[in-house]
Amino acid sequence: MFAGLPSLIHEQQQKAVERIQELMAQGMSSGQAIALVAEELRANHSGELIVARFEDEDE
């Protein structure tokens, strides 16, 4: 699977990690927290996008 992802600088990545940790500390599951932060990043990001390839490991 390929996805267009925001290209983030280190500071933005660090803030995203901190936001995920904050949400998890409030009781949200890690998957939900990651999905929410990813959605927020996509909605607010105005810079470049990178293409990433994800492989399903269900096989």
UniProtKB/Swiss-Prot annotation:
Source organism, top-level taxon: Bacteria
InterPro entries: UPF0181
NCBIfam families listed in its UniProt record: PRK05114.1 (NF003476)
Protein family per UniProt: Belongs to the UPF0181 family.
Record-given protein name: UPF0181 protein YoaH
Species of the source: Shigella flexneri
